[in-house]
Amino acid sequence: MPLKGRLGLETARVPHADRHGLMWLERGRLAVEDGNLVFTTAGFDDLEAGAYDIPYQQVSNILLGPGGVVSHDALRILARRDTGLLAVGSKGVRLYATSMPFGPDSADRARTHAELWADEETRVDVAREMYQIRLGGELPSHQRDLDSLRGIEGRRVKKVYQNLADQHGVEWNGRRYDRNNPDANDTVNHAINHAVTAVYAAARIAVAVTGTVPELGFIHESSGHAFALDIADLFRSSTTLPIAFRATKKVERQPGRDIEPTARKMAGATLRDEDVIPDMIDQIKDLLDRES
């Protein structure tokens, strides 16, 4: 198939090639033709069906979504150029594989991350900064006990839940989730679970492409993706919970709709339209790229 166009970072035809050099591709085959990296697609979002050159020299990571396949030669070219490849759900609502997230050609940020985490004082400093973001304001300088900060945030989140319930006209009886009997949860709690899963996947993508250390969380511990949980929580009030309550209201207005695909699709649209993953990357850089 002859090339129909050039898939560049500055073209409006590719809405997901963002300021961090992330290129989103779906419904097509990434392969090498005549020495060039080419994506042949059936079309998705604003991109018409056709074959497109990929300017991999300008791309930091390719995020390959549903319907995407990649050839061995394409993997070889990407590896040679230190261009990452991640297999993701539509618009980043899932992360399936990070086999080639080479990240920045430097260990500086990972080293800084580890150093900040290893020192008890700086670990608390970063955790406090995260709580400031989550709480939307400055904290008293003497407030360094994380348990008390968790209590403050817990009270604030309860208000966020109620405000969103009032705003969208959704009945709210509290946050509940029975892992042993998930079907017993009400619609809005199901929606929150699905929104949390999507935003957490977005945070894992942001952690992968920044070359930071997933296991080293400043607030969360034990999980192999503790840092992604930290980052996802920074967007709970602004992104995750609004998705859940909007999805719940949509299902209530249209009986017969399933909350899981509704919440997932709404999450994908939000991640794309509000540049959530680029914002997460910026947030990671702001937290870790600090003056020593």
Question: Can you annotate each of these PLM segments?
Answer:
Residues 41-46, 50-106:
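Glycine/small-residue-rich interface belts in oligomeric ring/scaffold proteins
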Residues 29-31, 54:
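Short, exposed beta-strand/loop patches in secreted or surface proteins that constitute
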Residues 1-21, 27-28, 35, 80, ...:
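Active-site helix-to-loop segments that bind/position phosphate- or nucleotide-bearing substrates
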Residues 22-23, 47:
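Short solvent-exposed loop/turn micro-motifs enriched in small/polar/acidic residues
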